[in-house]
Amino acid sequence: ILSAMLAYKTLYWIIGFFFTRKFKPAKNKHKYGIVIAARNEEKVIGNLLDSINKQDYPKDLLTVFVVADNCTDNTAIEAKKAGAKVISCTEKVSTKGEVLKYTFDLFKDNNKIDAYAIFDADNIVHHDFLAKMNDMINSGYSVAQGFRDTKNISDNWLTSSYAILYYFQSLFLNESRYNMGRSSFLNGTGFVIKKEVIDKHGFNPKTVTEDVEFTAM
């Protein structure tokens, strides 16, 4: 049994490392609502929004929403300075998943959004992220997870460990499953999901690991 499990994992590693599926750049440009759940993130939200503003994607097709989750600092002010629209979430919420549900419910009847892009407030986004994600959506995928990396990989053993974990998840799990035509799993941030999926199936996670829970759904 152990040999079979090892062979199974080895096959995944080989496929993830040596093979890749190609897709054509999309001609059809979708409209994205970028959603950022933020609670007291005034020190980092500007860096994320700056990277979003530098995306290689038509700016008129992007709307950035910072959901200020019961903030007691200047997160909303910093977000507005960077051009984002601020949504004040004053309801009693305890998880990021609940904040996302609150936001998706607000936009249920909004026909100006084709898909959501989800980020954490301390992220920095590569300049071609949305262009690549649009290629995936235009190829027929309803959900797409981006590559996740660590900004401060050399700070200490913990950040280095996270970098290894993210690389393992992206290359040896998600990339392999994608190359085999199978479903991958969401990794909490840096993913895109078509609005029609949320509208049809809902988004009501019950745990703090909303990404894993929604993947299973």
PLM region descriptions:
Residues 50-61:
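Short, acidic, metal-binding catalytic loop of nucleotide-sugar glycosyltransferases
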Residues 74, 120-136:
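Acidic donor-binding/catalytic loop of UDP-sugar-dependent glycosyltransferases
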